[in-house]
Regions:
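Intrinsically disordered, low-complexity and often Lys/Arg-enriched segments
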Residues: 1-10, 235, 322-328
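Conserved polymerase palm-domain catalytic core
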Residues: 44, 51-52, 103-104, 109, ...
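Gly/Ser/Thr-rich beta-alpha loop segments that engage phosphate groups in nucleotides
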Residues: 34, 179, 183, 265
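A generic structural signal for residues located within well-ordered alpha-helices
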Residues: 80-84, 184, 188, 257
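PAPS/PAP-binding and catalytic site of the sulfotransferase fold
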Residues: 88-92, 230-233, 237
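Right-hand nucleic-acid polymerase module
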Residues: 78, 87, 224-228, 245-328
Length: 328
């Protein structure tokens, strides 16, 4: 992996910090901490820059809350000032990480996303007889900091930047785990499994492969090849990344049975939304309709909800055979 210099200076550039503030504030300008930092940006950003340059910057405590989407998740929300730092760091590091990633890694990347991952998966299902679908047990919570920092340090050679990355990674709990919700966590988690992507493509020579963060799907012409790959993948994850597969979610089956992937079931000629996702969407629409009838939201908000729910169906040709616009 190529190592780069001059990155810390680019992160501290006043223009980069100012742009990071604007990106972090997008869609959140009505919140008090955001308004406060925007109002004080003339003094707050230079002060933040001084802390970063001196190595005295320390993140503030996280605000934590739980969601169920559909399974329970603990979300850690960084202080707005720290989110500005995350955006400033990612503006410089993300393009370097991006160069490492294979084309069929679809999470948290511009021009990718879950819909394109589904279409790509369907393209592979049309050309192979069997699939292997699996994911990582407690992925974000299991990311080893020593292993992750070694991967990040391979990108940058400046001690000051390495110290800043260690501060971000080790907060709030040192040793293991990344908080779900941070922009840095998304990019770092994507990089962490990049070794697996290159192993699948360059060592095992498997062309039929799609990853969406910790959801992995592989295709082959015979199930014996996939059983062997699953065993090798378990060994690689344990030895190199201190991770393990969810055995109860590891499936090897004919493509004609449909592969569960990202809330959908992928068939060679059809994409079908799975029950839990569909029920969540219906409940959301019922809530929005009730809010509209009660006068709590306007017609524009209700229409936004309807468009958001209908968008994936239109893009994916939900419920009918697809004529894919993606080159597979």
């Amino acid at each position: 992996m190529k190592s780069y210099g001059g990155l810390f200076e680019r992160i501290l550039d006043p223009a980069n910090l100012d742009a990071a503030l604007e990106r972090a504030a997008r869609g959140k300008r009505e919140r008090a901490p955001v308004q406060r930092l925007l109002a004080e940006r003339a003094t707050a950003l230079p002060r933040l820059r001084e802390e970063l340059a001196a190595g005295t910057y320390r993140p503030r405590p996280y605000e934590q809350f739980s969601i169920c989407d559909p399974k329970p998740r603990r979300i850690s929300c960084a202080h707005f000032r720290d989110r500005v730092v995350h955006h400033a760091v990612c503006a410089v590091l993300a393009p370097l990480i991006e160069r490492r990633l294979i084309a069929d890694n679809y999470a948290c990347r511009e021009g990718k996303g879950s819909h394109r991952a589904l279409l790509r998966a369907q393209g592979f299902a049309r050309r192979h007889g069997w699939y292997l679908k699996t994911d990582i047990r407690r992925y974000y919570d299991s990311i080893d900091h020593v292993i992750l920092l070694a991967k990040l340090y391979a990108l940058c050679r400046e001690p000051a930047l390495r110290r800043l990355l260690a501060v971000i990674v080790e907060h709030p709990i040192p040793g293991k785990g990344l908080p779900i919700g941070n922009l840095t966590s998304q990019w770092f988690a994507n990089l962490y499994l990049d070794e697996v992507d290159h192993w699948v493509r360059e060592v095992e020579r498997i062309p039929g492969y799609v990853r969406y963060m910790d959801d992995l799907a592989l295709w082959a012409h015979d199930k014996e090849r996939l059983f062997a790959l699953a065993a090798d993948l378990r060994a690689l994850l344990a030895a190199r990344l201190a991770l393990e597969l969810k055995e109860e979610r590891t499936l090897i089956a004919p493509v004609g049975e449909g592969m569960p992937f990202l809330g959908w079931r992928v068939y060679p000629g059809l994409l079908r939304q799975q029950g839990p996702r569909l029920r969540r969407q219906r409940r959301l629409l019922v809530r929005r309709e009730a809010q509209y009838l009660a006068g709590e939201i306007g017609a524009d908000k209700l229409q936004d909800c309807v468009r958001a729910l209908a968008g994936p169906r239109k893009f994916l040709g939900y419920g009918e055979p697809l004529r894919s616009t993606i080159d597979v």
